[in-house]
Structures are given as structure tokens and as C-alpha cells.
């Protein structure tokens, strides 16, 4: 029997908190399920909604001024959401509402509300780079890698972009300045800060509080536009979440990383924003070209890649004094693939203290082998490298999440060989190891190369797991 509790049965304070929140006397089941949430519920109840409404209006004025929404509509949407629990009787939905409201009342002001107050002065820190001088070199390098054959019958997934991306980008530019200890950017926007001729879409970010930020942003968009906003988690991308609107249009995504990982990511400071060091980004680009899908992207729009690569090449030339004279020495390092066991052996003794690197193409096999080694010194850099690294008895063990291209039966294509070398160099940069001579040789090994057709490629590691999501409108959290 679902009876109403009487005041002699339950502690008066807890009952009163729940009763005030629900605007009704809770059932016995509701009381027992919600009593441990009393502290969060009380914070929600005493939260100053008027100040919150004011902050959202200021955010709207600054970042979403072109969205046709009145102040009264924004207020009504906010008050409606903060009273939603009064018309909700499903315990699971009540828990979701409490969790999301708790995020708003405890974090919104510090995360997004702060963007409405006067910002610190921007410290101009740009260096003038001569990107034009690198364009021909970048084009030559990319042309030799433009070897993918596009299957016109292949159905490509469409990436629909929301019209709100430009508004969110404006907000993100300020967010990156205010929260530059916990959020950094990479990709096209970061290169745009170096070279204003770079075109960019959404802003790619790494941060230490991704889930909280995305929830706050999703509600800001919901309150301003009235649209249902959905947050999705993709199982095969580590700690990745994306915000989409009700029509599945992409708004923004983010990777979450630990603070200790954030601390070691190489970065530079431009106009109060930290961006991932373009040297590191260049290595990631070289690594990603081992992915067959990325080569298909190159084939479709080579000029987009050329602008980015030229920018990064000029950065490494200026910063590290790299001389592009074609002297490659031992690059790319020798790579031998065991297709049955899906392991590539890279000979590293010419450059590093460890004599070879065993690159696993299946992450669970690597994890099992590391356990068998009884070694506890592996480094996990999360989505920054999509891999752990371990050096044990002069051998590096690591995982490579991309495809391996073959130029002939059993022969690793030089594009993938360079990608594997870049993957090892990422570790060297993250651990403050030596990498500059190896970097110079790697980049010079990309010069004056003929196109080599792709014979075949390995399949990517299949990641288990299910998609997760937060649906604000339906009060559902599945993770």
C-alpha cells in the first residue's frame, strides 16, 4: 500500500524538505527513496532562481543575441524546469531531475555565469609566422599521402551541424580564457589563433570537468531556445560526450581528461588561451593519416589539410629550428607486422634507450600482457593518445587505435610506419623525453616521396560498450 507518511513516522525536517520540494506530501516510497537526497534537495529549494534567471539573460545577451527569445520566455522555461518535480511521480525521473538541478545550482555560476562579468585584460602573445613559405612543402608531403581510393558506393554518415555552433563558439572563446587551467583547445580553432587564414567549425576542447560543463551549457541552450537538448556518450571514444539538439544536429563535443593528464599535455599560451602545442598536434596528424578514413578525408579536401599542415610545419621550423633538407637518417623506423597476433614491432634502438616497441592493435590483449609482466609503471594518457604506454626491460608496450596500412602482403606502408613513429614521439613529448632529432628526421622522411598504393589495411580494434545519453526533456540518464 502506497500510504502518505504522517509526521510521527519520519523526522520532521527531512519530511518538510521533501514536501516543500514536491509541493505535496510524499508517499512512503517517495520519502524512503528521496530522504538521502535531502541535502541536495534543500540546496535546490533555497537556490535563488531570480539571480539565476538574470545570469541566463546576460549569457543570452552576450552570446546568443541573434536568437529570437524574450526575457519572459527564458524566465518561464527556467521556473518551469525548477518546478518540474511537482508534476513527476516516477522515482527514476525524480532522481534525474534532482541530479540535473543539483548540477545547475552548484556549478552554473562558476562555470558559465562568470562569463558575464568583466574579463581580465587579454595578454597579446602572438608571434608572426611565415606560413606561406611552408605551403609548397606541405602540399608535396600531402600529395604523396593522397592515395585513398574513394568507394562511391560507400554510404558516409552525415555530420549535421546546428546553426547554434557560431553562438557556442563565441561563448567558448571566452570560456577558454576564463577557465584556462581546466580547459584547453586543439584542432582548427587553435591553429586559427596562429594563422587567421585557417577556417574552423566548432571548437575542439579537452577539459577536466567535461560532464558538468556540458550539462550547464545544455541547459543554457534549452532555456534560451526552448529546444530539447541531448547529451550523448560514445563507447568507442574515451571519455567523450557530445551535445546535439532534438534534430540530431551537432552543437559541441568534449573529451574529459584527469588533471594529472592535463598537467603534462604540451601547450602554449595565446591571447589568454592555452592550446595544445602545434608540434604535438602535428604528430597526431601524422599518426591519424594511418587511419584509412582520414586518408579519404584528405582525398576529398586536400587544401583544408594543406593549410593546417603548413601552419604546423612553420611552427616547428620557427620553434625547434627544424631544417627541411631531406635528411631522414633512420626514419621511418623499421616496422614488422604480425598480422595473426595483430602486433607491430618497431625498431627504436637508433633513437631511444628502449630497443624496440611492441605496438598492439587490440587494447584488451595489451592489458592482459601488461598484467602478465607484473609491471605497474604504465602511463595512461586517456584520449590524448588513446593508449597506455609501458617501458619494461628495454621494451616499450603500447596500443595503436588506428588502422595499419599495408603496401604489400605483410609489409607496413610508410604512411603507417610514420604514424607509429609519431605515436612513440607523443609519449616522448608527454614525458619530457628527447624527441627533436627524431622529429626532424620524421618530418624530413615525408619530403620528396612518391605515391605508394595501399594494398590492404588491418581492421580497427572493436570497442565494447553501449551508448549513453542524458535526455533533459524526458528526465532520463543512461550511462
UniProtKB/Swiss-Prot annotation:
Keywords: ATP-binding, Calcium, Early protein, Metal-binding, mRNA processing, Nucleotide-binding, Transcription, Transferase. It comes from the Viruses. InterPro entries: PolyA_pol_cat_Poxvir (IPR004976), PolyA_pol_cat_sf (IPR037265), PolyA_pol_nucTrfase_Poxvir (IPR024231), PolyA_pol_nucTrfase_sf_Poxvir (IPR038419), Poxvirus_polyA_pol_cat_C (IPR024397), Poxvirus_polyA_pol_cat_N (IPR024398), Poxvirus_polyA_pol_cat_N_sf (IPR038337). Its EC number is 2.7.7.19. The keyword Repeat does not apply. The active site is at 202, 204. Induction: Expressed in the early phase of the viral replicative cycle. Ca(2+) 1 binds at residues 202, 204. It catalyses: RNA(n) + ATP = RNA(n)-3'-adenine ribonucleotide + diphosphate. GO terms for biological process: mRNA processing. Polymerase that creates the 3'-poly(A) tail of mRNA's. Heterodimer of a large (catalytic) subunit and a small (regulatory) subunit. This is Poly(A) polymerase catalytic subunit. It comes from Horsepox virus.
Amino acid at each position: 500500500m502506497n500510504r502518505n507518511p504522517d509526521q510521527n513516522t519520519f523526522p520532521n525536517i527531512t519530511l518538510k524538505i521533501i514536501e516543500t520540494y514536491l509541493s505535496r506530501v510524499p508517499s512512503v516510497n517517495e520519502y524512503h527513496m528521496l530522504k538521502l537526497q535531502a541535502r541536495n534537495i534543500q540546496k535546490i529549494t533555497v537556490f535563488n532562481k531570480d539571480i539565476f534567471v538574470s545570469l541566463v539573460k546576460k549569457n543570452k545577451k552576450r552570446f546568443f543575441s541573434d536568437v529570437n527569445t524574450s526575457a519572459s520566455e527564458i524566465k518561464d522555461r527556467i521556473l518551469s524546469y525548477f518546478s518540474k518535480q511537482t508534476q513527476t511521480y516516477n522515482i527514476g525521473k525524480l532522481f534525474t531531475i534532482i541530479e540535473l538541478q543539483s548540477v545547475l545550482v552548484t556549478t552554473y555560476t562558476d562555470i558559465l555565469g562568470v562569463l558575464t562579468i568583466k574579463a581580465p585584460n587579454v595578454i597579446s602573445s602572438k608571434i608572426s609566422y611565415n606560413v606561406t613559405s611552408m605551403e609548397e612543402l606541405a602540399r608535396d608531403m600531402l600529395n604523396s599521402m593522397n592515395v585513398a581510393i574513394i568507394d562511391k558506393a560507400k554510404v558516409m554518415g552525415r555530420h549535421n551541424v546546428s546553426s547554434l555552433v557560431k553562438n557556442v563558439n563565441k561563448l567558448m572563446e571566452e570560456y577558454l580564457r576564463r577557465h584556462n587551467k581546466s580547459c584547453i583547445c586543439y584542432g582548427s580553432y587553435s591553429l586559427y589563433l596562429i594563422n587567421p587564414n585557417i577556417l574552423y567549425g566548432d571548437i575542439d576542447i579537452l577539459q577536466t570537468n567535461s560532464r558538468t560543463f556540458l550539462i550547464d551549457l545544455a541547459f543554457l541552450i534549452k532555456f534560451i531556445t526552448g529546444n530539447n537538448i541531448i547529451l550523448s556518450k560514445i563507447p568507442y571514444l574515451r571519455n567523450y560526450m557530445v551535445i546535439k539538439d532534438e534534430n540530431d544536429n551537432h552543437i559541441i563535443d568534449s573529451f574529459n581528461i584527469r588533471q594529472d593528464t592535463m598537467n603534462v599535455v604540451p601547450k602554449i599560451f595565446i591571447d589568454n588561451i592555452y592550446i595544445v602545442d602545434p608540434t604535438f598536434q602535428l604528430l597526431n596528424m601524422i599518426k591519424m593519416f594511418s587511419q584509412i578514413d582520414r586518408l579519404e578525408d584528405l582525398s576529398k579536401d586536400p587544401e583544408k589539410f594543406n593549410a593546417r599542415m603548413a601552419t604546423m610545419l612553420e611552427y616547428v621550423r620557427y620553434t625547434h629550428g627544424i631544417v627541411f633538407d631531406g635528411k631522414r637518417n633512420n626514419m621511418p623506423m623499421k616496422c614488422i607486422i604480425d598480422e595473426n597476433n595483430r602486433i607491430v614491432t618497431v625498431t627504436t634502438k637508433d633513437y631511444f634507450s628502449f630497443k624496440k616497441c611492441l605496438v598492439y592493435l587490440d587494447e584488451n590483449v595489451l592489458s592482459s600482457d601488461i598484467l602478465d609482466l607484473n609491471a605497474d609503471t604504465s602511463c595512461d594518457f586517456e584520449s590524448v593518445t588513446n593508449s597506455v604506454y609501458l617501458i619494461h626491460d628495454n621494451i616499450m608496450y603500447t596500443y595503436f587505435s588506428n588502422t595499419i596500412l599495408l603496401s604489400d602482403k605483410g609489409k607496413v606502408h610508410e604512411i603507417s610506419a610514420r604514424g607509429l613513429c609519431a605515436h612513440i614521439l607523443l609519449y616522448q613529448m608527454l614525458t619530457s623525453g628527447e624527441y627533436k632529432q627524431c622529429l626532424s628526421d620524421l618530418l624530413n622522411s615525408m619530403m620528396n616521396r612518391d605515391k605508394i598504393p595501399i594494398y590492404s589495411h588491418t581492421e580497427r580494434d572493436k570497442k565494447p560498450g553501449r551508448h549513453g545519453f542524458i535526455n533533459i526533456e524526458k528526465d532520463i540518464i543512461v550511462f
